[in-house]
Regions:
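Multi-pass membrane proteins that catalyze or facilitate reactions on polyprenyl-/lipid-phosphate substrates
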Residues: 1-278
Length: 278
């Protein structure tokens, strides 16, 4: 029998889709909802399920940015064949994404027992939500927002890509929140910071989902819940991406800062009152 029902999978897929690319921590929200539904957040199958449904959200990014991805991969392919093409920004950007993914892969493999153990606690999630809000507020205030997407460099990609480790070690910090905050501190404008966060998330999140797939299928999560959760995640994430890009073009990140604090405080309250367990 599956530890997650189809109905629960649909709810979790919607939560994943809404929050994966918003700087509010999809992992944190998934753990909160899992706790409220009585699903053991540290169960190996549940952790695997959460990673797999991320693939639906990543598929939404691939579809939404299909033309950009084809352009970048085409430039990369031309550069591999022709040295003259290697000065093209898209060719270099493709390599930057690859290099920037290496740190999170190494840390993820080395620290997997810790990540799926003590650091999976909802107390850690609550604290990370609040701490991350402070970092995001400071980054949005201190960043000069003067550099566009064409101004990104190898240094930018490596620093932003490496910042994903914060969310890996401290669920609740938010991968998107960490990457967007780092990009803002590097003076990228909000739209450029958001798009860079999307592109850097593609290999890391896809790899995590595929890596966990065999475990999720083998230890208590059925194919039907996985399919339902992933499909819902895709549909909702696509809408979330479109909304976020329009939002950051005209607004600051203050709304997300306030929301994170409220959710973090609420989670501390629920844990303290014993409504949900850590």
């Amino acid at each position: 029998m599956s530890v997650i029902s189809v109905g629960q999978a649909i709810v979790l897929g919607a939560v994943e889709g809404v929050t994966e690319f918003l700087p509010v921590s999809s992992t944190g929200h998934l753990k909160i909802v899992e706790g409220l539904m009585g699903i053991p957040v540290d169960d190996h199958a549940v952790v695997g399920f959460s990673a797999v449904i991320q693939v639906g959200a990543i598929a939404a990014v691939l579809v939404y940015f299909f033309k950009d991805i084809v352009r970048i991969l085409s430039a990369w392919g031309r550069g591999l064949r022709d040295r003259e093409e290697r000065y093209h920004h898209d060719y270099k950007f493709a390599w930057w994404v690859i290099y920037a993914t290496i740190p999170i892969v190494l840390v993820g493999l080395a620290a997997k027992p810790l990540i799926q153990g003590p650091l999976a606690s909802l107390w850690v999630v609550a604290g990370s939500l609040i701490a991350g809000s402070g970092v995001m507020w400071a980054a949005d205030q201190l960043g000069r927002h003067k550099r566009g997407e064409d101004d990104t460099s190898f240094k930018d990609a490596m620093l932003v890509g490496s910042s994903q480790i914060l969310a890996l070690l401290f669920p609740g910090f938010s991968r998107s929140g960490a990457t967007m905050s780092t990009a803002l501190l590097l003076d990228l404008d909000r739209v450029a910071a958001t798009r860079l966060s999307f592109f850097l998330g593609i290999p890391a999140l896809t790899g995590a989902g595929l890596y966990e797939l065999k475990d999720a299928l083998g230890v208590g999560v059925g194919a039907a819940p996985l399919a339902a959760g992933t499909l819902v995640s895709f549909v909702v994430a696509y809408a979330s991406i479109a909304w976020l890009l329009k939002f950051v073009a005209k607004h600051s990140f203050n709304a997300f800062v306030i929301y994170r604090i409220v959710v973090g405080v609420l989670l501390f309250g629920l844990l303290g009152a014993g409504v949900i367990s850590s």
